[in-house]
Amino acid sequence: MLSFLVLVGLLAYLGLRPHQSWLLWLTAAIAGLGTDGIVRCHPAWHDRRAGASLLYFGLPALAVFGSGLFIHEALNGYSRPLAAIPPSLAIGLIAHAEYQTVDFTARRYGALRLGLAVAAYLSAFALYSMLMRPEVDVLFSAAAIMLVSGVLTLELLRENRLFGEGAILLAIAVGLSIAELRLVLYFFPLDSLLGGALLVIGFYLATGLVHHVLDHDLEWNTAAEYGVVAVAAAAAVIVTRLLV
């Protein structure tokens, strides 16, 4: 049902003329609140406070918002309605994964957390790319990227079972780091896709290092591996973008 509602919302946003931006905001809110409601139905969920499950709102809402903006800017014509199908189905899978991972002892916890991490990085790429467009004010872009990065970091930190003030402080730190990277990239002639890809690489590097710090297993060789992967990925992205 949630996937169907998201599909209807995305089709309305992408198909109606004149353009109605509020439809995307509404669809993102439905995805987030729907996931929140699904999580609260889990037998292991006992915290009945109003904002207790707010953590589960961020990823599905940002996934819908990012996919809608990306499709709107990247595609034209009849390909738009077809492109709305995969993200709509993905929201159903995200909601299912969020529900199952409420229980840290779930049999498929590791695989589902991996799927949620992939969804988080893809959502980050879609939103970063849209916020890197030349017509978007650089200060607004940096602020929005900080917010997006912080919210997605909170989702990723669930793997370390970190909640509360500690998680919020780490999310703010990661968000500020990626926002600073966005400001640095302003001085380079990058298109939005290349800029978005570089920001995702930075986001992956920051969140990966945070994971290892929280697990108390960050060593020099691990940090070096992340650095090599980040440099190699950035080089591959730049070369590919120049050749295409």
Per-segment meaning from a language model:
Residues 1-20, 166-244:
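C-terminal transmembrane helix-loop-helix hairpin of multi-pass membrane proteins
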Residues 27-44, 84-102, 116-128, 139-157, ...:
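Hydrophobic, membrane-facing alpha-helical anchors
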